[in-house]
């Protein structure tokens, strides 16, 4: 159980009305934070995990840098206005990508209505602040926030047909504006983009690679690694696969040994590199192999 300090209980903004001195399960507070944007629950969790709210914020800033959020600095854990507290839509999207890696987040983010039972027996209703959970087909996560200074904000995610999109809206004029704008972004993305499978691990490469000093004259090659790109519909032909392969390879080789690579080029810019490996093993050529090469296999059959 997590103890609730006076500091946590005294948080303004969205809250679940925690009582100072009560203790609640960690999962209850986490759910309150994800579903109800509860600032008091957020501070209570931070104090529990790191000993103080400030140490929690310090760790948030460290993690932001680890995630590449170069234009973000946290002064508090709640998002309430403070000097030096800032972020960008791109950084919020990066943070959302990280959140999507955690199944527990999805478990709570899709809850529409719930409640918190306090130690005293008092009950606080929880309503998901992300209306798109109910109103937009495929939306299964997101976080809202609003202050006079920042306006109405949301980072939401939706998935259709195996393609997941993230929409970030900052500074909307009203709550409905942020939801409408995010929904419009999703509509545009799903209508105009698709996932294009560029490479599949294990796919054979056309032709074979000559082998020097091996018991086989050549071997098959295959790709090692999957690559799928999010592309505007109708632009798939702009992707090029440019091989970087030697004229031959030297035996011996095990299956899976690196041989070369394939560059993935989009509009003249290299965006990825996929390893090319041996699709079969080849040993060194022995005396009998040499004779077979010279005189023909019929002598040994």
What are the roles of these predicted feature ranges?
Residues 70, 81-86, 90-301:
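Domain-terminus/edge residues, biased toward the C-terminal soluble/receptor-binding domains
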Residues 1-90, 94-103:
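Active-site-adjacent loops and short helices of periplasmic peptidoglycan-processing enzymes
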């Amino acid at each position: 159980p997590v103890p609730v300090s006076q500091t946590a209980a005294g948080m303004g903004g969205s809250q679940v009305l925690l009582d100072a001195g009560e203790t609640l399960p960690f999962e209850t507070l986490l759910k309150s934070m994800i579903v109800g944007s509860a600032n008091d629950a957020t501070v209570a969790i931070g104090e529990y995990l790191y000993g103080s709210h400030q140490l929690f914020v310090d760790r948030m800033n460290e993690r932001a840098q680890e995630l590449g959020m170069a234009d973000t600095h946290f002064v508090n854990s709640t998002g309430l206005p403070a000097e030096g507290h800032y972020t960008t839509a791109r950084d919020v999207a990066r943070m959302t990508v990280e959140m999507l890696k955690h199944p527990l987040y999805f478990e709570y983010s899709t809850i529409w209505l719930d409640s918190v039972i306090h130690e005293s027996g008092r009950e606080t209703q929880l309503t998901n602040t992300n209306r798109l959970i109910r109103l937009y087909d495929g939306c299964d996560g997101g976080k809202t926030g609003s202050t006079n200074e920042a306006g109405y904000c949301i980072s939401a995610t939706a998935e259709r047909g195996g393609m997941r999109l993230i929409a970030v809206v900052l500074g909307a004029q009203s709550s409905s504006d942020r939801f409408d704008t995010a929904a419009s972004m999703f509509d545009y993305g799903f209508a105009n983009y698709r996932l294009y499978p560029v490479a599949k691990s294990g796919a054979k490469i056309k032709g074979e690679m000559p082998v020097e000093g091996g018991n086989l004259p050549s071997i098959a090659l295959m790709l090692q690694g999957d690559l799928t790109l999010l592309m505007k519909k109708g632009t798939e032909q702009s992707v090029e696969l440019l091989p970087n392969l030697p004229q031959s390879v030297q035996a011996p080789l095990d299956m899976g040994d690196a041989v070369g690579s394939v560059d993935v080029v989009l509009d003249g810019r290299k965006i990825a590199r996929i390893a090319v490996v041996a699709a079969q093993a080849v040993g060194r050529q022995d005396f009998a192999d040499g004779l077979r090469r010279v005189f023909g296999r019929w002598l040994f059959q």
